[in-house]
UniProtKB/Swiss-Prot annotation:
Cofactor(s) the protein needs: pyridoxal 5'-phosphate
Lineage, top ranks: Eukaryota, Viridiplantae, Streptophyta, Embryophyta, Tracheophyta
Protein name as it appears in the record: Low-specificity L-threonine aldolase 1
Tissue specificity remark: Expressed in root tips, seedlings, carpels and seeds.
Gene: THA1
Stretch forming the signal peptide: none
Length: 358
């Protein structure tokens, strides 16, 4: 029987801390759909202040937060949004911007670092004079950090250049900042500088920050007022959400300072894995709390076989594809867990790569 468990599937797997549970039990609450929950107001005001925006809104999930933002900016059905071909909104959010929002996605290739070529973004913007034949571009979306690129960070300079393109063409800029605080810590830049160019931002509370539930979207006061209506339409209006927001307020105080340690542990794990025969990790690309580990070409191993072997020792992982495993560090992973994980990997690699005896 496995006694030790090291859950590296995602930073969404964390359990509420004792301080969070206490805050949730004692949270001051009211009906948030009617706009009276005081703890929700505290969280929204704090997030708006941190992001340098006028207002904020608690939403049940990052997927809903992104969908609401796209629908507010693209309020004419058939509008077009420009976004990366490997971004979360396009790949992992069930096509909601199209099926629910009536918004047409136009993809631009994501580079290895999560950026999109600036010239390609500008070239993708439709000429309004041709709107009889194709959709009107109303929005550009960025993702920071970029999950499918391994948690890579978009710089202030890059984001501002995209913002300049958006303004030049009269379109809006939305940032999917599910792990925005990770980018802030990694780059050593306050979050408000990372999103200054954006008209709206979605920030997840249950990923790096480790709260149990929810996301927040921020933007102008008029944007948030429209977002409230869309949230209600999508079924995202909830009553006494102060119970959830109380945990998020604790997360901002308790876990935000821990993100730098998550990044150090991710780098430590990546460096150790990269020294093992049969495994390849681009250590330089490990900028935050995420690691992509690939099986070397010609290896007898598959990601799924390795994942199952490690699971027997309590190491929980998600397979990216047949030759890739994704690893995500969070605040409940200790340095001891990292060393234990490396020892389990080392043992698995030795036993699984041994030639079969006939």
């Amino acid at each position: 029987m496995v006694m030790r468990s090291v859950d590296l599937r995602s930073d969404t797997v964390t359990r509420p801390t004792d301080a969070m549970r206490e805050a949730m039990c004692n949270a001051e609450v009211d009906d948030d759909v009617l706009g009276y929950d005081p703890t929700a107001r505290r969280l929204e005001e704090e997030m708006a202040k941190m992001m340098g925006k006028e207002a904020a809104l608690f939403v049940p999930s990052g997927t809903m937060g992104n969908l609401i933002s796209v629908m507010v900016h693209c309020d004419v059905r058939g509008s077009e949004v420009i976004l990366g071909d490997n971004c979360h909104i396009h790949v992992y959010e069930n096509g909601g911007i199209s099926t629910i929002g009536g918004v047409h996605p136009k993809t631009v290739k994501n580079e290895e670092d999560g950026t999109m070529d600036l010239e390609a973004i500008e070239a993708a913007i439709r000429d309004p004079k041709g709107s009889t034949f194709y959709p009107s571009t109303r929005l550009i979306c960025l993702e920071n950090t970029h999950a499918n690129s391994g948690g890579r960070c978009l710089s202030v300079e890059y984001t501002e250049k995209v913002g300049e393109i958006a303004k030049r063409h009269g379109v809006k800029l939305h940032i999917d900042g599910a792990r925005l605080f990770n980018a802030s810590i990694a780059l050593g830049v306050p979050v408000h500088k990372l999103v200054k160019a954006a008209d709206s931002v979605q920030v997840c509370l249950s990923k790096g920050l480790g709260a149990p539930v929810g996301s927040v979207i921020v933007g102008s006061q008029s944007f948030i007022e429209k977002a409230k209506t869309v949230r209600k339409t999508l079924g995202g209006g909830m009553r006494q959400i102060g119970v959830l927001c109380a945990a998020a307020l604790v997360a901002l105080q308790e876990n935000l300072p821990k993100l730098q340690h998550d990044h150090k542990k991710a780098k430590l794990l990546a460096e150790g894995l990269n020294q093992m025969k049969g495994i390849r990790v681009n250590v330089a690309a490990v900028e935050t709390n995420m690691i992509f580990m690939d099986m070397e070409d010609g290896s007898r191993l598959t990601a799924e076989k390795l994942r199952k072997n490690l699971e027997e020792n309590g190491i929980l992982l998600i397979r990216g594809n047949s030759s890739r495993i994704r690893i995500v560090i969070h605040h409940q992973i200790t340095t001891s867990d990292v060393h234990y994980t490396l020892s389990c990997f080392q043992q698995a690699m030795l036993t699984m790569q041994e030639p079969s005896r006939t």
